[in-house]
Amino acid sequence: MKMKKCPKCGKYTLKDFCSECNEKSVTVKPPRFSPVDKYGKYRRALKKAKM
């Protein structure tokens, strides 16, 4: 599952189509690497919740 962005309204989603404007969403570039992981605890919590 990859994060996607609607090119029309700019909203982020995990779905193939935007829930706001029903436009096909596209895959976004990965965030820049940083040794200080500000959002690591959120990613790990999301991954743990899916298991």
Swiss-Prot record:
One of its GO terms (biological process) is pseudouridine synthesis. Pfam families: Nop10p. Keywords: Ribonucleoprotein, Ribosome biogenesis, rRNA processing. It comes from the Archaea. GO terms for cellular component: ribonucleoprotein complex. Belongs to the NOP10 family. This is Ribosome biogenesis protein Nop10. It comes from Methanococcus maripaludis (strain DSM 14266 / JCM 13030 / NBRC 101832 / S2 / LL).
